[in-house]
């Protein structure tokens, strides 16, 4: 993904670029720091670095089991490594998870200090850690007011504990969804891809979004077996409603103004579900679903302008 954003650097001028998120278990923090510094130079100071351990289901596919290995301590250590390497260009460090002796780099970022943000979904400890040490928290798939409040409150606790002003940090939420003038295809598409995310969502997050883990267990088991079509058949329609924002521009405006902003979030990240994504993931087509470009333009024209005003 870093290569993709590097390619986009010369074709953009204002948008900030970076993967959401980069995994510090699968990739060494010093390598991540060098990629971030290089992208920052290519973009003239527009690089984003959001790091995480990734979800446990993904790591298991790589044969890695993090249970019982103190992932929060790993995140804290990775943050220290990246902060030092980006600021000084060299590092000597002997930690529990990472060790370096005389390591240096010529890759230097434009932004100083370089902002480093933490990605987290389960919480609350990762949310608190972000408030304590990072420049922000990027969470994902928090749709209900309960889920949003839970995240924001834990983030604030961490900031308060460290004597930091949480309002000066970047609190963001990545929401999955689709936008269209006709809400029917948008809702159908969102259900398809929301079902795919079930296996990556911890039970606690499902419950905070009003989803009973037992109710969706059959669909999750089908996904684990690789039976996508059966999983989609077993996923109840309520999953699409609870785990996405889908419909007309007004539906998006309502979600942002009534829930996201009041909970304290100042940054929205959106993963739009387009025909290509539905076809590649589920092997189906949905009549009337706008393309990605059409959804982006509709969102910019109708939603961003309304919220900004």
Question: Model features per residue range: what roles?
Answer:
Residues 1-309:
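Active-site-adjacent structural elements that line small-molecule/cofactor binding pockets in enzymes
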């Amino acid at each position: 993904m870093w290569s993709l954003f590097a390619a986009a650097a010369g074709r953009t001028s204002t948008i900030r670029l970076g993967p959401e998120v980069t995994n510090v278990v699968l990739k060494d923090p010093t390598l991540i720091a060098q990629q971030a510094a290089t992208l920052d130079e290519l973009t003239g100071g527009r690089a984003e670095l959001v790091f995480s351990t990734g979800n446990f289901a993904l790591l298991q596919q790589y044969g890695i089991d993090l249970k019982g290995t103190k992932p929060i301590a790993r995140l804290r250590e990775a943050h220290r490594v990246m902060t030092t390497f980006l600021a000084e260009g060299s590092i000597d460090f002997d930690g529990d998870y990472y060790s370096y002796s005389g390591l240096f780099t010529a890759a230097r970022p434009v932004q100083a200090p370089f902002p480093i943000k933490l990605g987290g979904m389960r919480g609350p400890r990762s949310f608190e850690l972000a408030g304590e040490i990072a420049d922000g928290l990027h969470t994902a798939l928090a749709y209900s007011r309960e889920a949003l409040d839970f995240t924001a409150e834990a983030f604030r606790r961490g900031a308060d504990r460290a004597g930091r002003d949480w309002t000066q940090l970047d609190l963001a939420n990545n929401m999955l969804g689709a936008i269209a003038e006709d809400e029917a295809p948008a809702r159908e598409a969102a259900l398809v891809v929301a079902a795919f995310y079930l296996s990556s969502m911890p039970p606690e997050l499902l419950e905070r979004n009003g989803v009973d883990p037992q109710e969706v267990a059959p669909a999750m088991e089908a996904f684990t077996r690789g039976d996508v079509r059966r999983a989609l058949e077993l996923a109840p329609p309520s999953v699409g409603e609870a785990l996405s924002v889908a419909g007309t521009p007004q539906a998006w405006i309502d979600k942002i103004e009534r829930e996201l902003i009041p909970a304290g979030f100042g940054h929205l990240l959106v993963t739009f579900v387009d025909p290509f994504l539905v076809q590649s993931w589920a092997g189906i087509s949905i009549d009337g679903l706008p393309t990605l470009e059409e959804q982006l333009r509709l969102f910019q024209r109708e939603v961003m302008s309304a919220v900004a005003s």
